[in-house]
Amino acid sequence: MKTKSLFLLFALFITTALAACRPTSNSNNASGVSVTDASGKQVVVSDSSCIISVGTANTETIYALGAGSRVVGVDNSSAEYIEESAQLPKVGPRATLSAEGILALKPTLIIANADAGPPQVIEQFKASGVTTLVLPSNYTVETVKVKVRTIARSLSLEAKGEELANSIDHDMQEANALLNRAQSKPKVLFVGRGPNMPNATMSGTGTTIDEMIRLAGGVNPMSEFQGFREMTDEAVVNAAPDLILITQRSFERSGGIEGVLKFPGVALTPAGKNRRIVPVTDMYFQGFGPGVGRAVRELVIKFHPELGAGTQPAPSSSSGGEQR
């Protein structure tokens, strides 16, 4: 009975998605527009009325451009962290996509990053005739703006894309103006614990977190490894972080400050002794998206208390919806 109910629910998702895939005057360009993908090749997009978006930053960008109504399926992380896409069909984790499930939604355009996969599935999308736009997956502010402009052009929304890219510049200018006033250079250790993870982990280099720490004027003391590792007493104590950074969900899951102080070594660090454990919204570390400048500005304020309590984070901008 449960299996039958799940099947009917998935069928309803697909039916709804297919009904939404009707080209509109502003999403169907008969001659097509040409955009450059991560490999430097030109991709011609002639119909963007029915989009599968893989990657939270890509999904965030599409909604920020006001084209959320064109999205008919997203990866699991997008569904989890971007409220507007929570009820859409999920196509799996970005690194383990299934061609059958995605192609069943009859997309006209698939947008993903270069780290999506497996590679053979991406090739299946292309071989099936579905326009597939693969974007860079490196973590820099300049890459964010390139991706915003590329996605906007692929959706025939270039003016909105330019406006969004300019807003990123403005947000980063505000963040850097604050940073220029800062006098400290704190060692910032990012830690976390997933819902199904028995042990807490910490971030090394080569992650969105590492780059965000750098942009906000901090120093990641875990520079000897890439990616993530389980926390150990010795590594954390030797790192001697001034501040512990953690996502809000992980903070709550761990039992707040008292729970984080029980993570390996934390209580013996300057951050632990001074209770400088700072939770931030999870979206900050879900890939660089158009909100990167606002996120950096808030982190600058949290990292550098000498800037003063009166310095407030900039308000978040809301994404508009495109009307059909």
What residue spans do the PLM features occupy?
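Short helices/loops that flank or line small-molecule/ion binding pockets
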Residues: 99-106, 232-240
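Structured C-terminal subdomain patch of bacterial secreted/periplasmic proteins
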Residues: 23, 143, 149-153, 162, ...
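Short helix-initiation/N-cap motifs at beta->coil->alpha
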Residues: 36-38, 89-100, 138, 225-233
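Extracytoplasmic ligand-binding site segments that recognize negatively charged/polar headgroups
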Residues: 118-121, 133-150, 184-208, 252-255
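Alpha-helical, coiled-coil/dimerization segments enriched in small aliphatic residues
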Residues: 76-80, 88, 201-228
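Bacterial Sec-exported substrate-binding components of ABC uptake systems
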Residues: 2-6, 19-59, 159-190, 243, ...
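A short, structured surface patch at a secondary-structure boundary
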Residues: 50-105, 109-114
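Bacterial N-terminal signal peptides
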Residues: 9-17
